[in-house]
A protein has these predicted regions:
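Rossmann-like NAD(P) dinucleotide-binding subdomain of oxidoreductase/dehydrogenase enzymes
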Residues: 1-116
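ALDH superfamily catalytic-core signature
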Residues: 72, 78-205
Length: 205
């Protein structure tokens, strides 16, 4: 997802209204949270107001969401993890705010603006396709179905994967080998279930 954005959306409002908090960032993307913690320390916040704890969800996350001193949990992540957090929170009626996986769709009619198809595809690819609010499918008017396929094929094949620190018109890799393998599994499943692959494919998400 968007590590610094997600962290700030949760941390800043909580601190602004006088709450104390514990932040556990994703174990795959902790650096933004560490930088923020250093800034908060430089700003001389009282000790204990903001607390950073690193670790994975299965151990650290489980311990935090089960702890009796935690009154509210705000979580952005997978539906599976959200269900586990809800179970922990229910034991002592913690308040919970969950932002979980979505299944957004693009809907494009014949009279849509000329760049609607490409813009919809861009929203899928943005952040290397790792945004929880990225569209997952496109529904197009039947009369322009073939045109939409060709335009999407051309647009998708123009994308290149390269070093995210370099400037240029490319996207970075996904965050981990585990995520890459998950994508490969989903591509294969789609093909096995009858999907017509027109861009990318096995080994090249």
């Amino acid at each position: 997802n968007w590590p610094m954005n997600q962290v700030c959306l949760k941390v800043i409002p909580a601190l602004a209204v006088g709450c104390t908090m514990v932040l556990k960032p994703s174990e795959l993307a902790p650096l933004s949270a560490i930088v923020l913690a250093e800034l908060i320390d430089e700003a001389k916040f009282p000790k204990g107001v903001f607390n950073l704890v690193n670790g994975d969800g299965a151990t650290t996350g489980d311990a935090l969401t089960s702890h009796s001193d935690v009154n509210m949990i705000s979580f952005t992540g997978s539906t599976r993890a959200g269900a586990l957090i809800s179970q922990n929170a229910a034991k002592d009626f913690k308040r919970v705010s969950l932002e979980l996986g979505g299944k957004g769709a693009n809907i494009v009619f014949k009279d849509a603006d000329p760049e609607a198809i490409e813009r919809g595809a861009l929203r899928c690819f943005r952040n290397s396709g790792q945004s929880c609010n990225a569209p997952t499918r496109m529904l197009v008017e039947k009369s322009m179905y073939s045109e939409a396929i060709e335009r999407l094929k051309k647009y998708a094949n123009e994308f290149k994967v390269d070093d995210p620190n370099k400037e240029g018109e490319h996207i970075g890799p996904v965050i981990s080998e585990t995520q890459y393998n998950k994508i490969q599994t989903l591509i294969k499943k789609g093909i096995d279930e009858g999907a017509n692959l027109v861009a990318g494919g096995p080994g090249k998400p």
